[in-house]
Amino acid sequence: NVNHYYNNWAYFFDLKETNAKLVAENVTLRNQLAQNFVSIDTSKKLGTLVLRKDSMEVVRKFFYYPAKVVGNTFTLQKNYIWVERGAKQGIKKDMVAINPDGSIVGIVIEVNDNYSKIMSLLHRNSKVSAMLKRDKVAGTVEWDGIDPDILILKNISKSASPKIGDTVLTSPYSSSFPAQLMIGRV
């Protein structure tokens, strides 16, 4: 049936546009998540003067920007990701980079007008303050430089008993990453 083949081809060629629409919709939805906002403590006058608030008296903590990956290494000891979004599009040094699933992938270390360089979690100098979601035990996630599919959770309490499948999140003690972003699973 010619009509069937035409519809399949038309569908195939529309996938790029459909994907772009879905990315934009996901970004819009992520930017509306309640965890991106914090209520203002009205007892602290300085905070209410400095922070920008919306009509519901809440302040935006995070804002998501979609970015196209234009380069990526994962076989070196110091791996980086390059994205096609820079200072002109709102990106700043030390911003966190996450993947479409919401897991962290690294931190922005260099920004020019239209591109940014991200230090990947697969970088020997990358260290992330982390915790096990189940029992809130804190530790540090690092890469050992060997297997790009495995990160190491170090410096956890000897009393901790991580189990296969446990979720590892960023901890509230991190100076670089917001708390409770997904890192991976044990």
Regions found by a protein language model. Give the residues of each.
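A secondary-structure micro-motif
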Residues: 1-17, 21-23, 28-38, 42-185
